[in-house]
């Protein structure tokens, strides 16, 4: 029996992308800039002893040529010498969540998704009219690019008074719809998003995201954990599909199942927040009998701290992640492997609030994994190729196993 565990540190880029300037992201480096700037926010310095023992600082230096300044602490990882480390370039046309995850699963996105304008009005009037008519809503609020946590404080009370849901977008390929979980209704919000997902297809939009929230007045509204993503299906079989077809178990934790539209997933586990995501990951790894994949997305790095340009929060989240990492070791069998990686960057020191085009780390450890610098990889798909080789699945012919 063997397991492949993928820990996706959403948005934890390590700089050095050769095409960063083409995306307006020259010099962006999520890892390095957090390490350099965290002390200015009252921290004593970024301490990631367990990730560092697995080669994270080396991977960062491979990507950008600069070594991140980390506080030296003793690692608790017994498998510190059983790790391959490197960095990976992205070949997909975008720097969004879907592109990064699909490419890592063996299906690069060669043509960028469609995007709605960031300026008001973001959404075509005829599309909005069709959605309103089909869903039976009196209209919409927002209709612009916005931070989801900010716009519910701005328009939450008006939403409650009018019954109009809040529509907004971002630099990613998406339409996000926020509504009060109780007053508007969670199932009603989900149905609205299903209708909207059908209507955005001609615009090649990757996702419609339901964003339920709770509270009574502006300044006191909070998102609930019942987010749901409606995403396009990958255009070709991913490593998840191939694993499922071969009889392997594929456990998707957090938003992973939604990102792949449920394709290739045998078990979906809902969780939110770093603590619960870690708890569920450890539980699922321990309970998995037989060959399989456990895949977790740690979304807080992106959603809570990257987009909000919160250096302090991001740094503290990284250190929490690092402290939990040794708990995984005792659950690993002789043939199990763990991948630690990311889907894109989101440098909290960079102007704006968008993702940043960066290389991402790839750390692979396990009891039988030799210590090795695997260098600069040409595509995220190398992870899919490596998992395919491990389980004897048909290769993708896109990347190279390591």
Task: State each model region's role.
Residues 1-402:
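Feature captures the catalytic ectodomains and active-site-proximal regions of enzymes
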């Amino acid at each position: 029996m063997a397991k492949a565990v993928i820990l996706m540190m959403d948005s934890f880029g390590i700089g050095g992308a050769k095409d960063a300037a083409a995306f307006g992201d020259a010099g962006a480096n999520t890892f390095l800039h957090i390490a350099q700037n965290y002390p200015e926010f009252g921290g004593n310095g970024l301490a990631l002893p367990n990730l560092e023992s697995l080669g994270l600082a080396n991977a960062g230096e491979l990507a950008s040529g600069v070594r991140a300044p980390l506080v030296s602490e003793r690692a608790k990882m017994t498998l510190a010498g059983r790790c391959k480390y490197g960095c990976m370039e992205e070949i997909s046309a975008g720097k969004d969540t879907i592109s990064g995850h699909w490419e890592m699963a063996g299906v690069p996105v060669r043509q960028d998704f469609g995007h709605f304008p960031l300026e008001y009005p973001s959404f075509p009037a005829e599309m909005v009219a069709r959605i309103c008519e089909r869903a039976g809503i009196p209209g919409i609020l927002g209709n612009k690019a916005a931070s989801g946590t900010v716009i519910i404080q701005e328009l939450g009370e008006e939403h409650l008074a009018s019954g109009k849901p809040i529509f907004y977008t971002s630099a990613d390929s998406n339409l996000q719809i926020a509504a009060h979980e109780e007053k508007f209704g969670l199932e009603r919000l989900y149905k609205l998003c299903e209708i909207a997902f059908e209507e955005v297809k001609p615009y090649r939009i990757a996702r419609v995201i339901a964003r339920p929230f709770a509270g009574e007045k502006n300044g006191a509204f909070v998102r609930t954990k019942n987010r749901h993503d409606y995403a396009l299906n990958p255009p070709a079989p991913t490593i998840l599909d191939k694993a499922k077809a071969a009889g392997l178990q594929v456990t998707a934790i957090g938003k992973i199942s939604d990102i792949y539209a449920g394709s290739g997933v045998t078990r979906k586990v809902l969780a939110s927040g770093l603590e619960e995501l870690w708890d569920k990951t450890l539980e699922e790894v321990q309970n998995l009998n037989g060959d399989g994949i456990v895949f977790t997305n740690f979304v807080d790095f992106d959603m809570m701290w990257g987009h909000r340009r919160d250096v302090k929060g991001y740094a503290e989240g990284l250190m929490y992640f690092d402290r939990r990492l040794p708990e995984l070791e005792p659950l690993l069998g002789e043939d199990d492997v763990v991948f630690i990686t990311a889907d894109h960057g989101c440098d909290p020191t960079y102007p704006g609030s968008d993702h940043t085009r960066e290389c991402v780390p790839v750390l692979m450890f396990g009891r039988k994994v030799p210590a090795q610098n695997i260098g600069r990889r040409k595509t995220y798909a190398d992870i899919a190729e490596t998992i395919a080789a491990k389980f004897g699945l048909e290769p993708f012919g896109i990347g190279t196993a390591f």
